[in-house]
Every structure is written in C-alpha cells, then in structure tokens.
Amino acid sequence: MPFEFPRADKPEDVGLSSPRLARIRDALQTDIDKGAIPGAVTLVARRGQIASLDALGYRDREAGAAMKSDTMFRIASMTKPFTSVAAMMLAEEGRLLIADPVSRYIPEFANLEVAVDSDDRSVNKPKTEPSRREMSVHDLLRHTSGLTYAHLAGPFLKSDYEDARVVDEKQTNAEMVGKLGRLPLTYQPGTTYAWSKW
C-alpha cells in the first residue's frame, strides 16, 4: 500500500491562501482551454501536509482520458535539480563521494575513449584517444563529463549517437548506459562545459 501524505482540511490550516492557490489552478486551466498544454497536476504542501492537489485537463487529449493525480510524466531537465540534491544528500551521508569515478557506480563508464578533432574529412569515424582521467561524479553534476546530446556532438559523433539510438524511449536505463559507455566522449572529462541530460 503506498504511503499517503496527510492532508490539511483547508490551506489556511497550514498558513496558505485558498484564493491564491485557486489562481494557480485558474492559470493552468486557461492554458489547457487554449490548447497550450493538455493537462497538469499540481501539489502544494506545507508543514508536512498537502494543502492543495489538483489534476486538470487530460493525460491523453485524443483519447479523452482525464488527468489523474498519480499520472506519471517525463519531466526532462527538471530531473537535474532533484538528482543533484539527492547526490548531495548521499554525499552528506558518506554513501557517495563526489570525487569518485563514475565507473565505481556504473562499470560501463570505465576506460572511456574521447573523440579527437580531425581536419581529415575523408574518415567516417572520429579518431579517439583514451580519456586522460576517469569521469567523476562531480563532472556529471557540473556538465563537464564529456557526454553530450547528438545534435551538439559535432559531425563525426552525431551520426554515432544517432546510429546507437541512445535516445530510445523503449530502452531501459541500463541499455542506454551501455550504449553511452561504448561511444566516444566529445571532450576530455573535466575540461569543457556542455549541457547534457546524461
């Protein structure tokens, strides 16, 4: 049985305003009515209690399926702050060292290769060299790991990323990590900042 968070009888019981919370709901409903978004779920909690929980619009507009409060979403880059906070909490507990090599936790990231820029356009695959040091957890948190998006990888690596189907919604995280571990990094770990979802 899933854990149920306690609910406040009314928002004012935890120091929030019902009319102000209604403004959030109204603004989202306006976007739903305009077709800007299909639906949304909002939850506002304070002092350990849920003050407001709303499911608005549709989880599947075409099928007419209403949004539910437990509908699951892909939240894209919003996972980054959650992941960073979780990593810092694990570090505080001594269960994760930020300076550790990623391969300590994900063996597929050991012995990575790094693409080397080349002016020789006659080759189909990028030249590679071994990474000078292992990718660290810190590198992942600050986007200096050498991993990147296919469209940012440059002409040589772009096709490698696309051919490997790194982004495939049907694969498991383990399958994706295996693919990433076989691809060359775009730069040496710790040397260059590049926004990445990995």
Task: Give the location of each predicted region.
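Active-site-proximal loop and beta-strand segments within enzyme catalytic domains
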Residues: 3-7, 22, 29, 58-195
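Short beta->alpha transition motifs characteristic of CBS
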Residues: 50-60
